[in-house]
Amino acid sequence: MKKILIMAGGTGGHVFPGLALAEALADKQVKTVWLGTCNGMEKQWVDAAKIPFYTIAISGLRGNGLLGWLKAPFNVFKAWRQARYIIQQEAPDLVLGMGGFVCGPGGLAALSLNKPLVLHEQNATPGLTNKLLAPFAKKVICAFPQSTIKGKQVTVIGNPVRSGLESLPVVKAHSPRHLLVLGGSRGALALNEMVPEALSLLPEEQRPQVIHQTGQKTLQQAMSSYEAANVAADVVPFIDDMVSAYQQADLVVCRSGALTVSELMAAARPAILVPFPYAVDDHQTANAQALVDLNGGEVLQQADMTSELLAERLQFWMADKRCETASRSIRESAPHSAKEKIVDELLTLCDSSVH
């Protein structure tokens, strides 16, 4: 039985694509084990998926000051030894890095043991670890063609996304329009305030039906904003059935995390994207550009956004079949079947490593 060790940690943006691949690999009779960090949130998700879970002691360098940088070589060496021991014990056919601090020492350990290393980069702007490891990897799989990682080992496939999105029909003309606002698990305060204000500036006959997902922490703030603006909306902390939510939507207003942009592509839903302004290396702006390049939306920087500007852009997109045209453009040009294609790549590399 083939075995793949998956390295991922830190945020859902790294962990959830790894879990999607682990599930698809299990369907192909491939065993997976997981390497994460001691203090990351990934353990609860991986345990829930019943995947054997190992940890190493490593954390990020950004924001740790001079002392953190001075300690870094010793911490990386210690984590490298831990990862090397785990890889020796598990003896995987291949090591897959999905992102997070764990991939630095884990990737170096895999290389030191001559294990094939595959990297998956979810964002258009690669993280530091992937940039450093990419020249030594057997394969680098990128989500977006805008990625700055280059080389003969690089291939653009996409991000694994939830099942059912790619089979959704494209947007069809109807009235009223349906607007989906996604604040993410932690909420987006700027969207909570700005979207209700913008909608209040539209004539009532032009206002769309609204579903606004806020996250638990900002639910009350968003509900108060809609009430103050005298705008009707279905405000919810979480959406259990995202496929249905995308199916109903004609237009989406959201941040531009890698998985959100990939889901928009898979669902063929146009969007007004408001990148999180404090993202590392401004990677959300680069992610957003991937959808814009498919004629599937536009970027509004939070610093430039006013309720008047957002109202004008909402009117623009909801008029003259622009949503329908953009939806068709996305469906015709966006990557598809990413999960299946990545699994095929991994199985091929596993076979070549055995022989």
Swiss-Prot record:
Pathway: Cell wall biogenesis; peptidoglycan biosynthesis. It is found in: Cell inner membrane. GO terms for cellular component: plasma membrane. The keyword Metal-binding does not apply. GO terms for molecular function: UDP-N-acetyl-D-glucosamine:N-acetylmuramoyl-L-alanyl-D-glutamyl-meso-2,6-diaminopimelyl-D-alanyl-D-alanine-diphosphoundecaprenol 4-beta-N-acetylglucosaminlytransferase activity; undecaprenyldiphospho-muramoylpentapeptide beta-N-acetylglucosaminyltransferase activity. It is a peripheral membrane protein. It catalyses: di-trans,octa-cis-undecaprenyl diphospho-N-acetyl-alpha-D-muramoyl-L-alanyl-D-glutamyl-meso-2,6-diaminopimeloyl-D-alanyl-D-alanine + UDP-N-acetyl-alpha-D-glucosamine = di-trans,octa-cis-undecaprenyl diphospho-[N-acetyl-alpha-D-glucosaminyl-(1->4)]-N-acetyl-alpha-D-muramoyl-L-alanyl-D-glutamyl-meso-2,6-diaminopimeloyl-D-alanyl-D-alanine + UDP + H(+). Cell wall formation. Catalyzes the transfer of a GlcNAc subunit on undecaprenyl-pyrophosphoryl-MurNAc-pentapeptide (lipid intermediate I) to form undecaprenyl-pyrophosphoryl-MurNAc-(pentapeptide)GlcNAc (lipid intermediate II). This is UDP-N-acetylglucosamine--N-acetylmuramyl-(pentapeptide) pyrophosphoryl-undecaprenol N-acetylglucosamine transferase. Its main location: membrane. It is an enzyme of class 2 (transferase). It comes from the Bacteria. One of its GO terms (biological process) is lipid glycosylation. Its EC number is 2.4.1.227. Keywords: Cell cycle, Cell division, Cell inner membrane, Cell membrane, Cell shape, Cell wall biogenesis/degradation, Glycosyltransferase, Membrane, Peptidoglycan synthesis, Transferase. The lineage of its organism: Bacteria, Pseudomonadati, Pseudomonadota, Gammaproteobacteria, Thiotrichales. UDP-N-acetyl-alpha-D-glucosamine binds at T11, G12, G13, N123, R162, S185, I239, A258, L259, T260, V261, S262, E263, Q284. Belongs to the glycosyltransferase 28 family. MurG subfamily.
